[in-house]
Amino acid sequence: MENNNNNNINKTNTPNNSFSPIKNRIEHFERMSSSPNISIPLSQKEYYCSPKKNISLNNINHNINYNNNNNNNNNNNNNNNNNNNNNNNNNNNNNNNNNNNCIVGESNIINNNKDDYNSNNNSTINYNIVRESNSNNNSNNSNININNNSNNNFEKEKIIENNKEYINSDFDSISNNDNNNYNNNNIFIFEKIEYNKEEIDCVIAINSDIESNKNDENDDNYKNHNYEIIIVGENNNSKEDCNSSNNSYDNDSNSNSDISTSVNCNSINNNDTIDKNNSTNIIKSIENNNKNNYNKNNNKNNIKSIFENILIKVFTIIDKESSKLIQGLKIENKLKSQLSYLEEDYIYQTVLAILQTKVLQVIFNDVFPNSNIYNDNENNNNNNNNNNNNNNNNNNNNNNINNYIVEESNNNISVIDNNNNSDNNNNNNNNNNNNNNNNNNNNNNNNNNNNNKSNNYIVEESNNNSVIDNNNSVIDNNNNINNNSNNNNNNNNNNNNNNNNSEQNFTYNEKKIQNPIIRCIRNLREIRIKKIPKNIHVDLFQDYRNIQIIHNQFPELFTDSINDCYKIFHHFCLTYSGPDVKQFLCEFSKIGVISCSDENENSSLYYAIENKVNGLQLVCEMVCNGLINIEMAKKTNKHGHSILCKCINLKNIPILKLLISFGFDHFEICQNCKNTDQDIQDIFDDIYFSMAYFSTIPDSVNGKLIKTNIALLTELIYSQEKLKLLFKVANAPVPTEIEKAVNKFIFKMDDYKTKYNLKKNEIESIEKVGIIDKSQLSDFSIIGEGGFSTVHKATYINLQNTITPVAIKSFKNYDDDSFERIYKEVSVHQSLQGENILKLIGVSKLKFGLSIIIEKCDMDLKNFISCNQINLDLFFILSTQMVNSVSQVHNHYPEAEINVYHRDIKLENWLIKTIDGNHTVFISDFGLSRSNTESNGCTLQQIRGTNLHIAPECYKGFLFSSQSDIFSVGISLYQLAYKLVYGKFVHPYHEYQIADEPENLNIIQNTGLIPTIPPNLPSRLKRLLFLMMSKMPERRPSIKECIEEIQKCKEEYESDRTKWDTEISVHEDYSLLNEQMINQYHYIKSDVLDYIRDFDLNQNPHDNYVQELESFDYSSYFIKCKSFNEDR
């Protein structure tokens, strides 16, 4: 979903969240001038239903009576209480119950109801139905009234018969209390939905709130409604496609089970009335004018239909038998793939929570069989309402929910502690003082002064808010139950009526548990509260907008010292791993908690350092933007530890470099860290040089150019047990009688032809490979090991009894990807032929897995150069064969104009064999080699090879080419030339102290650095190395030109050996960052710019490089590096 919020969000306005049924939205819409339809922004689909009753939105009370207890003798109704007195007495029921029953069960609607509207209907029923609403309506609101034009009462039996009792089973709490309005705000329509050409029984509950402007209460323009549509029903045969454009609602049907969905709809006009005769449009949803909130296509925007379909599928399976939970889990996995585009959406989270809760329910019942987790404690005390005294002592507070009220939001678990409000049950004959009714029967005046202001408890199950008032909080849903008793008899007690209410509530709760949605969500909340501490700071910041909303509406949370708001930010720095770091810091900076320290004097940086995902970016943003007091952050904590010490202990070198570059004192590391002198010196060396190029790696801070090592991730994902299993399967012993048959036909089976992505020519090459029997190999011993394979040496006896020393390359993994790589390597290696290409003898199935048998050499070229002195004669022998071997690979198919690229050229992959003093160089390891065919286009665009040897264009996503291999050959020849001049072997870029790390590789990619070529080389040889390592592929010579140039250098040397020997005589190694390095880059820059003037780059894909080259000041860069080196 798109988020159109700016970083600088006004505190007074609620941000524009993208559309989701569970998110709070405060929107105002234009009134409809002429149409009787009600315009509600629901989605980009339109839904229609027909009315069953005539509903007026002007009288907003919903009163339908189960029990006809109204006495119509001169009733004086005061303050919305139908106090019926048979003796013509005035019953003043001053019920100051703000928030009487708005927060129950899964509700999160906040109703600060202050204005009560009159209800004049004779047949009422009070529904206290609270769903998983997500609206946050702090409005001066009252009840919703369904005006029944007839005088007939709706009997309970009739409603149950017509609606299969799904009212009681689907909603949270129903209090059937006579003549007592609980500020309910729900309209109910019992309809039938036409869904995918089938009919579904449903109940539609329209939740309405009125928001009035206190300054102008008479102006209807300031009144708005907030609607919630709740659909209950099931369709066992529903199809997956739920994108129907119309859902028609009819009147008559029965429902079969409980499936529900809810959609919040905002803001209709107060004066619009739904007419009974208008059968087309009670509710019509149209596209919202604010298009920014609906940037989704039609298939994704039909949230309601998708949610209906998913719930139907899920509960069709999991509600049949609890033992079939495995089917529910399969559905869960299926939903993950089907709803991948809704990963952060309400639908995805809710459905998975319900599925998981169903499993947890069974597990919990098995572990705690005696737990009353599914009992509704809020009604445990209903039967305590029996009071047989002659006075009207109404023990209302025993009906309160005194056990627990826990609400779960997507961001927080909020808990209300049970305190001592349950001690309000006083059985004195005349006075009930603790929040009870003071009833005096002597004068027949029942003054029910219920001062049970439930202002101390507001619990939200909102996506954005979780609030708790810290007073002795008990939700008094039943505070007014006994007020009904004052409406019936003057001298008789109302205990019977109270008992009736208790029975009704008890019956309701028995049925309510049958609803799978409410039950699952309630169970999930109950199970989670046993594991999560009662702390408001837990997971508060799932969305940075929540911080602003909570701060605006409940600022006391951020000012109360008890809550310690800075802990919220410290917890954020420690654990947050998502995006929008800058927006979060913007919101926290407005609150003013970023610079706060905890009780141990640890600043926010202490916690950000431990964040393995966003730690570097958090520290960089806070320090660079001045959000934190650096001078305070530099100080040590109570334990004498500094931030730099913590970086060392956590081995977080990148943050350590960053902090030192901003002026943190690095000498305290020596004083406080238990490191050896050499360790500290190495750290300083790394820090000083990193400061020189720190300005070149802002992209690495944001993680844009850091490449993930997929192989490493895969290895980490696999558990050790699975790896052992793979090895066990791969190395399973083969019976002797069939081993020869398996070896003989291992490459003749048909499965590898279809199972792996092999081409026709590759299959033909594989079939030509010889199969070597295990008995022909002996004398195994390991000689080397790499990241993907292990090399053994052995003795091979062929059919002519000729003994040949061989090398055996076996692989560490034998999954499908590994087998495909093995087959491709065998295919390429078998097809290549040349005097400088290592010979492939065959393959064999050995105890350590499928292995490749190759010709054995003495050692690789890296070890040879390290162990031997190099002179000019040996230099030309080795260099000539090195470039010849690459030429034999590149030009293997000249007639077909197909080149094979090695893609992993380095000294380790050249092998050398010495016979009678004659050195022969072979190129090997063709695991990454591919041809430049069209089918290999994607493969050649991937980054493959060894870091520090890969050509710069490969990092930028360009196709691999023969010129990319030339760059790698140039790096290897540089290492050979360095040993020639200075007498020691070095790694590429050693003079810059660049290790094989992502941050350092970023420098090579962005600056065009190449290894410093020894200045004592003859100019012709020096220029060849410059060209081979050029950043521009077009500037590099072809492999044929390299062979010719080396041959000319050799001829020049042979014509004047004395001159060359004098120039190439062993010199002392130059110090780092010397003038030669600066002069070299001036030469590179001028040389490349000359090339640009002679070459048309309009059609060249590397023109971006030219702009980078012209804008980059090499001299200032290296002068800066040099100054840091001299300071040392």
From Swiss-Prot:
Enzyme Commission number(s) from the entry: 2.7.11.1
Classification via PROSITE patterns: PROTEIN_KINASE_ATP (PS00107), PROTEIN_KINASE_DOM (PS50011)
GO CC entries: cytoplasm; nucleus
This chain belongs to which protein, by name? Probable serine/threonine-protein kinase DDB_G0283337
The similarity annotation says: Belongs to the protein kinase superfamily. Ser/Thr protein kinase family.
GO molecular function annotations of the record: ATP binding; protein serine kinase activity; protein serine/threonine kinase activity
| Domain Protein kinase positions | 777-1054
Highest rank taxon of the organism: Eukaryota
Sorted keywords for this record are: ATP-binding, Kinase, Nucleotide-binding, Serine/threonine-protein kinase, Transferase
Q: Residue ranges of region Disordered?
A: 1-21, 60-100, 131-151, 236-256, 375-504
Comp. bias regions, Low complexity:
1-17, 243-256, 375-502
Output the GO biological process annotations, alphabetical, semicolon-separated. mitotic DNA damage checkpoint signaling
Name the Pfam families for this protein: Pkinase (PF00069)
Asked whether the UniProt record includes Nucleotide-binding among its keywords, one would answer: yes
Catalytic residue list: 904 (proton acceptor)
Q: Does the keyword Transferase apply?
A: yes
- Catalyzed reactions: L-seryl-[protein] + ATP = O-phospho-L-seryl-[protein] + ADP + H(+); L-threonyl-[protein] + ATP = O-phospho-L-threonyl-[protein] + ADP + H(+)
List the transmembrane segments: none
In this chain, ATP is annotated as bound at 783-791, 809
